């Protein structure tokens, strides 16, 4: 299986600097591995007892078990920040991108989401970051208010249905997949000959 987050760890450890990799801490590697924001949680609490061996097993599982990265839990609060930042950074941008290509219009957004989060990237990011800061301040975890979590959850479901699985995008993704496979086959053949 390919997980972009595990591939990022691989790049840092084995590919960067002409194959020498970088010397980074276990906590940094763990935050990178856990940054995948596809699983929304109301509360992000670190697994402070996670060991190097557990990290290595999680890294291995990302390559060998389907959806393994969805179950990852960062070992530090900073890693939790990285994980939720992934969602915060792309949710509003996905809306603006979908609007710019004509898949979505502002009037299509769920009314309860717009009321709580707003209808553009800037307002959504401001609301999510502000709410997270208010409800996480001086706590050993990160969390959203119930209202913001519900709005964000609704928005993610809406985008999944109306944007990420839109027929036009599905068709284009199928084309891209075929093109990448063809390129891979051509380059593999060149390497073998």
Language-model features: where?
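Active-site-proximal cofactor/substrate-binding loop regions of enzyme domains
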Residues: 1
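Histidine-centered, transition-metal-coordinating active-site segments
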Residues: 5-6, 11-19, 23-193
């Amino acid at each position: 299986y390919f997980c972009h987050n595990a591939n990022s760890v691989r790049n840092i450890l084995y590919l960067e600097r002409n194959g020498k990799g970088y010397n980074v801490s276990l906590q940094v590697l763990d935050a990178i591995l856990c940054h995948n924001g596809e699983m929304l949680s109301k509360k992000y609490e670190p697994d402070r007892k996670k060991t190097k061996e557990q990290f290595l097993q999680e890294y291995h599982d990302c390559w060998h078990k389907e959806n393994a990265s969805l179950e990852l839990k960062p070992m530090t609060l900073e890693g939790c920040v990285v994980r939720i930042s992934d969602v915060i950074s792309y949710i509003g941008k996905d809306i603006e991108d979908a609007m710019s290509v004509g898949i979505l219009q502002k009037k299509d957004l769920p009314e309860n989401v717009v009321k709580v989060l707003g209808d553009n990237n800037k307002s959504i990011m401001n609301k999510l970051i502000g709410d997270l800061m208010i409800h996480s301040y001086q706590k050993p975890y990160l969390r959203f208010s119930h209202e913001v979590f519900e709005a964000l959850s609704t928005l993610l479901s809406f985008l999944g249905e109306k944007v990420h699985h839109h027929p036009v995008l599905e068709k284009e993704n199928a084309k891209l997949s075929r093109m990448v496979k063809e390129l891979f086959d051509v380059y593999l053949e060149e390497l073998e000959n």
